[in-house]
């Protein structure tokens, strides 16, 4: 009993790496290997690091705002203009306090995104799609492998960040217990530093998870854009044309070129032969041409065909083995013969013209 295996079954399996065209097309659709956790982690880390530098500025601005609010704003007469002035002043002060952090977060987010995918804008991502409203597909997305991975990632982030924060608190356990004994300024300074260390620890832990997530996203992306052998064949046909059709076109072009070449053989003045392997058809008109040029050439069966046509049309054939081989190798069809061959060709053409005069 013979077991027959249909190889077409395996042709549909996506086992091949994506072609450059497939990668380009998916990129245009906004499908790239990217982890949003990297943007979040980098932004948080840069924000907390920048607080080391701009923290004193923010503290001074905040204390100045509080002082002004309690010394001046609370004593102002309640009126529409004063409320408006107070509201504008509040927005201005809050903007001055938060602007550096917001700017740092924006720059960090843009840079981290650029490092992952480069410059990319795809309108297709923001286009509304009715398939997203399909409850069946929505249900499948909820219980898909990607959803499970996202759930695991969320749990890991909570656990890791929680552990990092707990570790910082545990390391400063004694100092936390002494907080009631500190002055307000000392307590504020300690809490600020503690918050900063917790933020840096949490952001660092998130960055490690984000790096792992990026590797997973890249692996998942490569898996999703894999192609089957049939996909690659179809893509090649669309971009380059069907190989069978292209080969037929090339064959037709060769046949047409061959036909045109053979039509020029009767017009030749002489055929230089090897005598059996090479045949070179030359034409020369001293009134129109500076040098003889080749109208046809060939080897073996093609040389035989050229000699046959030449014989049918009484075109003289001259045997010169080295010249025939040299002309075949160095000169193309419809190309003038180089100067180095002028002397020997002049002798051959003179012999041909002299022979024709005797005949006629």
Swiss-Prot record:
Keywords: Bacterial flagellum biogenesis, Bacterial flagellum protein export, Cell membrane, Membrane, Protein transport, Transmembrane, Transmembrane helix, Transport. One of its GO terms (cellular component) is plasma membrane. The chain crosses the membrane at residues 38-58, 94-114, 151-171, 196-216. SUPFAM superfamilies: EscU C-terminal domain-like (SSF160544). The keyword Protein transport applies. InterPro entries: FlhB, T3SS_substrate_exporter, T3SS_substrate_exporter_C. One of its GO terms (biological process) is bacterial-type flagellum assembly. It is found in: Cell membrane. This is Flagellar biosynthetic protein FlhB. It comes from Bacillus subtilis (strain 168).
């Amino acid at each position: 009993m013979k077991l027959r295996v249909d190889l077409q079954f395996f042709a549909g399996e996506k086992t091949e790496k994506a072609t450059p065209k497939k990668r380009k097309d998916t990129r245009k659709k906004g499908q790239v290997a990217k982890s949003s956790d990297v943007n979040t982690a980098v932004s948080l880390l840069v924000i907390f690091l920048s607080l080391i530098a701009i923290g004193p500025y923010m503290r001074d601005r905040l204390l100045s705002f509080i002082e002004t609010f309690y010394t001046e704003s609370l004593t102002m007469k309640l009126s529409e203009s004063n409320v408006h002035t107070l509201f504008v002043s509040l927005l201005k002060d809050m903007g001055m306090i938060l602007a550096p952090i917001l700017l740092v977060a924006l720059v960090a987010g843009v840079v981290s995104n650029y490092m992952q995918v480069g410059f990319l804008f795809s309108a297709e991502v923001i286009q509304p799609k009715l398939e997203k409203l399909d409850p069946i597909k929505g249900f499948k997305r909820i219980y898909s492998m990607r959803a499970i991975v996202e759930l695991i990632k969320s749990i890991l982030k909570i656990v890791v960040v929680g552990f990092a924060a707990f570790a910082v608190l545990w390391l400063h356990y004694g100092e936390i217990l002494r907080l009631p004994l500190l002055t307000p300024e000392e307590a504020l300074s300690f809490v600020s530093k503690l918050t900063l260390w917790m933020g840096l620890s949490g952001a660092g832990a998130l960055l490690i998870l984000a790096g792992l997530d990026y590797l997973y996203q890249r692996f998942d992306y490569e898996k999703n854009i894999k192609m089957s052998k049939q996909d690659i064949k179809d893509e090649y046909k669309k971009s380059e044309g069907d190989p069978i059709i292209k080969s037929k076109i090339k064959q037709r072009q060769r046949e047409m070129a061959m036909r045109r070449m053979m039509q020029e053989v009767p017009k030749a003045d002489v055929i230089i032969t090897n005598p059996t392997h090479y045949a070179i058809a030359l034409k020369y008109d001293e009134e129109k041409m500076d040098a003889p040029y080749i109208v046809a050439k060939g080897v073996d069966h093609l040389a035989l065909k050229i000699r046959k046509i030449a014989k049918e049309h009484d075109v003289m054939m001259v045997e010169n083995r080295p010249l025939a081989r040299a002309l075949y190798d160095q000169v193309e069809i419809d190309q003038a013969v180089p100067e180095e061959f002028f002397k020997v060709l002049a002798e051959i053409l003179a012999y041909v013209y002299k022979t024709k005069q005797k005949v006629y």
